[in-house]
Swiss-Prot record:
Higher taxonomy: Bacteria, Pseudomonadati, Pseudomonadota, Gammaproteobacteria, Moraxellales
Family: Belongs to the thiolase-like superfamily. Thiolase family.
Residue positions of the active site: 90 (acyl-thioester intermediate), 357 (proton acceptor), 387 (proton acceptor)
Protein name as it appears in the record: Beta-ketoadipyl-CoA thiolase
Keyword Transferase included in the entry's annotation: yes
Group of enzyme by EC: transferase
Length: 401
C-alpha cells in the first residue's frame, strides 16, 4: 500500500454570518485557499494535479454546478485539472480528504487538492415548481442549513428534527446538563481567545481582501466568530433555541459561518519529484450511520470503528479535533469514549462553538488545525471527527512525519 501525505494546508478566516466574508461568492471564496496552495508551492507542476475534490453542503446558489470545478478554475489551475464536489453535509471536506488519500494509496493519483467551501450568509431561498398549471402549492425554502423539501415518507420513518432539536435529543438521552454544556462552550471560547492572542491561527489562515466601492479594500485576516468576552454568567442567561427551558442555546452551539479550506495531498513519488515536505501521513478514515434524531452522537461509534480499523487506541491520540456542532453532542461523544470533559487533547485551541462551522469547509479546517497542533506540540497522532446531519459520523487519523 502506498502512502498519502499532507504537504500543505491552508484556510480562509471563518466569517460571521452576514459578516466580512458575506460579500464573497462561494466559488470565489473556495478559490482563495487553492490559489494560496499554488503560490506557496512553486515547485509543483500544477498541470499534473490529478484531481480537486471539494466539499460543499448547500449547492443551491452560487455554489451550484460543481463548485469544486468553479473554484479550481477561478484559482488559476489549468483547465486540464479535473475537479468534483462532494456532499456529505458537515463532513464533506473531511470526506474529500479521505477520498483523496484513498486514491493516492491505491496508486490512481499522485497529487490531489482536497478541501471545501461554504457561504452560509449567501445561501439562497429556493422555490420548487408547481406540479400543475396555475398551482399554488409551491414552497419557498431557506437553504442556509437543515431540512428542505422534506419527503413525507422519510418524515414518517425517522422524523425530521432540526439540528438544535437533535442536540436536545442527545442531551436528554445521554443526560448532558445545561451547566456542563455552558462550561464546555466557555472553555472553547477561552481556548480560542488564548490561541488568537498568541497568533496561533495566523500560520493556517490566508487573508481575504475585499474590494470596496469607495476607499481602500478591506482585509479579513482573523476569524470573526469568537467571542472572547463570553462568561458563564452570560451563557446561563440565554434561552433555549428549541424551547425556552431547553439546554441547547445559541451560546453552546456552533455558528452559521462562511469559509473555505484546502489541503495538498501527495504520494511518495510526488513528494520526491517536486521536492515537497511531507508533514503528515493520512493513516485511515471511516464513516458510520446512526438514527438521524441523534445525529450528533455519531462521532463516538465512528471513532471506535476507526481506532479498531487502524489498530490504534484513543490513548495514542495526541490531538483530538472533535467538531463542536453543539456542546451537548460533543460531551455525549467524549463521555462515551471515556474522556474527561476538559481533556486537554480535545480541541486544544477551541472548536466550532468559538471558531464557527461553515459546513462544507469545517472538516478541512479540523485537519489543518490538527496538523499545526501536532507540529507545535511534537505529537504523533491526531484524530479528527464530525457529526453529520441525517445521522452520520466521520473520522480520520493523521500521523506527523
Amino acid at each position: 500500500m502506498k502512502h498519502a501525505y499532507i504537504v500543505d494546508a491552508i484556510r480562509t478566516p471563518f466569517g460571521r454570518y452576514a459578516g466580512g466574508l458575506a460579500a464573497v461568492r462561494a466559488d470565489d471564496l473556495g478559490a482563495i485557499p487553492i490559489a494560496a496552495l499554488i503560490e506557496r508551492n512553486p515547485s509543483v507542476n500544477w498541470a499534473q494535479v490529478d484531481d480537486v475534490i471539494y466539499g460543499c453542503a448547500n449547492q443551491a446558489g452560487e455554489d451550484n454546478r460543481n463548485v469544486g470545478r468553479m473554484s479550481a478554475l477561478l484559482a488559476g489551475l489549468p483547465v486540464e485539472v479535473p475537479a468534483t464536489t462532494v456532499n456529505r453535509l458537515c463532513g464533506s471536506s473531511l470526506d474529500a480528504i479521505a477520498m483523496a488519500a484513498r486514491a493516492i494509496k491505491a496508486g490512481e493519483a499522485h497529487l490531489i487538492i482536497a478541501g471545501g467551501v461554504e457561504s452560509m450568509s449567501r445561501a439562497p431561498y429556493v422555490m420548487g415548481k408547481s406540479e400543475g398549471a396555475f398551482g399554488r402549492t409551491q414552497k419557498i425554502e431557506d437553504t442556509t442549513m437543515g431540512w428542505r423539501f422534506i419527503n413525507p415518507k422519510l418524515k414518517a420513518m425517522y422524523g425530521v428534527d432540526t439540528m438544535p432539536q437533535t442536540a436536545e435529543n442527545v442531551a436528554e438521552q445521554f443526560g448532558i446538563q445545561r451547566e456542563d454544556q455552558d462550561q464546555f462552550a466557555y472553555t472553547s471560547q477561552q481556548r480560542t481567545a488564548a490561541a488568537q492572542a498568541k497568533g496561533y491561527f495566523a500560520k493556517e489562515i490566508v487573508p481575504v481582501t475585499i474590494p470596496q466601492r469607495k476607499g481602500e479594500p478591506v482585509v479579513i485576516a482573523t476569524d470573526e466568530h469568537p467571542r472572547a468576552s463570553t462568561t458563564l454568567e452570560g451563557l446561563a442567561k440565554l434561552k433555549g433555541v428549541v424551547k425556552p427551558e431547553g439546554s441547547v442555546t445559541a451560546g453552546n452551539a456552533s455558528g452559521i459561518n462562511d469559509g473555505a479550506a484546502a489541503v495538498l495531498i501527495a504520494s511518495d513519488e510526488a513528494v520526491a519529484q517536486y521536492q515537497l515536505k511531507a508533514r503528515a501521513k493520512i493513516i485511515a478514515s471511516t464513516t458510520v450511520g446512526i438514527e438521524p434524531r441523534i445525529m450528533g452522537f455519531a462521532p463516538a461509534p465512528a471513532i471506535k470503528k476507526l481506532l479498531k480499523q487502524a489498530n490504534l487506541t484513543l490513548d495514542q491520540m495526541d490531538v483530538i479535533e472533535l467538531n463542536e456542532a453543539f456542546a451537548a453532542q460533543a460531551l455525549a461523544c467524549t463521555r462515551d469514549l471515556g474522556l474527561a470533559d476538559d481533556d486537554a487533547r480535545v480541541n486544544p485551541n477551541g472548536g466550532a462553538i468559538a471558531l464557527g462551522h461553515p459546513l462544507g469547509a469545517s472538516g478541512a479546517r479540523l485537519v489543518t488545525t490538527a496538523l499545526n497542533q501536532l507540529e507545535q506540540s511534537g505529537g504523533k497522532y491526531a484524530l479528527c471527527s464530525m457529526c453529520i446531519g441525517v445521522g452520520q459520523g466521520i473520522a480520520l487519523i493523521i500521523e506527523r512525519v
